[in-house]
Amino acid sequence: MLLQLLFVLVAIIIGARLGGIGLGVLGGLGLAVLTFVFGLEPTSPPIDVMLMIVAVIAAASCMQAAGGLDLMVKWAEKLLRKNPSKITLLSPLVTYIFTFIAGTGHVAYSVLPVIAEVATETKIRPERPLGIAVIASQQAITASPISAATVALLSMLSGYHISLMDILMISVPCTLIGVLAGAFCSLHVGKELAEDPEYLRRIANGEFTSDQYRTKGVENHRAALLSVVIFITATIGIVLFGSMTELRPWFSLPDGSSRQMQMAHIIEILMLSAAALILLVTRTDGIKAVQGSVFSASMQAVVAIFGIAWMGDTFIGGNMEELKGSIEHIVTEMPWLFGLALFVMSILLFSQAATIRAMLPLGIALGISPYMLIALFPAVNGYFFIPNYPTVVAAINFDRTGTTHIGKYVLNHSFMMPGLVATGVSVALGLLMIQLF
């Protein structure tokens, strides 16, 4: 088993270094080694999870193509420019809401330069709002009803009669309070901008310009607004179907019994329908949807789940008895330790959904309560730990003052403190909630 684990970890590390779809395809190579060299039987690939994510990507990409994302950024810019002194508290709420609505953290790219510029103009150290804004976009993944991670968790806990509302009632308040805690801790990070040596050096060397960043205009305001309304309506529909099971239709089977429509199918149908309506109502070119940043970045996550999660699932399935025998008694006594395992795995996989898909079968097999697993859900937000995730790199590049940085020892970077605070508070509150309620 240890040799198999070594191959799995090597595949993950090399895949992460390759970037893009590298993580997913290396997972496929690792799966080939597990199957043909070690003789493990492949488990079923996560088809339902992947199809749900593809449907959400289709809708979000169409909204972006219709100008909906640009319109949301305009709204965010107006809010931040009207309240510049509160930017450290408002910017994480903006990126949290963006991600909560769209289901992907990649929408944060569009608002990060606005945050950086408003902070600079107000003479607030940009590191403070940027650091927690990036973390908020990650935390919201585990609160969004249509994110790949939430969809994967819901799919895998369906056998326990867990509804979407059961997940959201814990994950939304916990992650939101965690983000606010991180924001308050960020209020006094580092020196004031006027005293920062890197900022002063850039001014002295003429590297800092006073050019203002402005978001691009919305070409067709009506089409953009319609796309946002259609997308949000579909999201609300998913929440309603997920929380009120009586709304889901029943179908008669040939043997006389009946079966209720699966939540996976509802998500797929509503999101594909939303995508179609956006294209039809706004007369947006479908080709434009696949050329946007949301489609490209999110499809990489699908490939990652396909390869990495399938490889991880096969490894865990093939070694389940040995794994249970070695760690079951520890996890039974201290189930929160499974949260630490989720955190570490998310650092390696750079994906909340892939982490859930790879690790949750082990948690279920170890007998961990489904509500405990929901409470530990925010622990999969650990990929800020190593500062090479695209949104982290983007935030550093957008900060012209140089205050948002990676430290000399790599791990002492601008996102470590807000990330640990937000994740720690979210998980702690989740554990408290399941004990009280």
Where are these regions (language model features)?
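Hydrophobic transmembrane alpha-helices of multi-pass small-molecule transporters
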Residues: 1-60, 197-313, 417-437
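Alpha-helical transmembrane segments
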Residues: 48-57, 167-182, 257-271, 372-386
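Helix-loop-helix module between adjacent transmembrane segments
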Residues: 57-61, 91-107, 132-144, 171-181, ...
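Membrane-helix interface motif
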Residues: 145-156, 243-252, 311, 315-320
